[in-house]
Amino acid sequence: MQIKVINETNKTVQIFQCAKVKHRALAWLCDVFLLAIVLVVIFLITQAFSDNRFLLFLVLSCSQTILWTVYFIFLPFFWDGKTLFRNLLKIKLFAFDKRFLRIMIHELFLWILLSVLFLVIASYFFINQNSSEALNFFTNLDKPNAIAITIRTITILISFLQLIFIGYFCFSSEKQALQEILSNTFMVQEKHTLKSKPTSLKTNNQPDPANLPGVIALDEVEKLIN
C-alpha cells in the first residue's frame, strides 16, 4: 500500500510505502520494554523511600500515564511521527492532518487496553499486604464474589479485544493496522520516493465559430457582394 503526498509549494509528490508487520511489531515491543524498564526503576526508587503500597501503586499509575503520553504522543508529534525504536527501524507514523489528535487516538487504542489490566489487577495486589491472599481472591472458584467476577469479565473482554487486534495486525503487512484505520494514520517506511508533480497545460479547446463548416463570416459575405 502506497501513500502519496502532494506538495503544492515545490510541486513534488512523495510516495511512502506502508511498513511491514515485523518492523512495526518489533518497534512497538522494544518501546514498551524500554518504558517497562523505566517503570521498574521508578518502582525500586519509590520502594526504597516508602513501604506504603497504596502510594507505590499511585506513583506507578501516574508514572505509566506520564511516560506513555510523553513517549508515544508528544515525542512522535515533535519528531515526525517517530519514537526511539521507530527511528532505528526507519519507520514513522504519518497523518495528513490534525497530527496531535491522530497520534493520540492511535496510541490510546493500545494504552487503554494495557492500562485497564494494570489498574484492575495491580490495584488489589498493591493495596493488599499479602500477595498469596490476593492471588487466592482471584483464583478461588469455590467462593465467588462480585469483585472477582467483574475483574475476570473485564480481563476476558480485554483479552478478546487484544486477540482481534493481534489477528488483524498479523495480516496487515504493508497495510493499515486496526488502530491506524481508527485514527486515520499510516505507519510508513521513512525511505520514500520523490517525484515531480505532473503539470497539465490548460488549452482553450473552444473552436472559433468562423472556422466551423457552414458558417461564413460577415466580412466575407460583404466581399462576395461587392
Curated annotation (Swiss-Prot):
Please identify the protein, giving its name as recorded.
Uncharacterized protein MG243
Q: Does the keyword Transferase apply?
A: no
What's a GO cellular component annotated to this UniProt protein?
A: plasma membrane
Provide this UniProt record's keywords sorted from A to Z.
Cell membrane, Membrane, Transmembrane, Transmembrane helix
Give the record's membrane topology.
Multi-pass membrane protein
Q: Where in the cell is it found?
A: Cell membrane
Listed transmembrane segments: 25-45, 54-74, 107-127, 153-173
Q: Which Pfam families match?
A: RDD
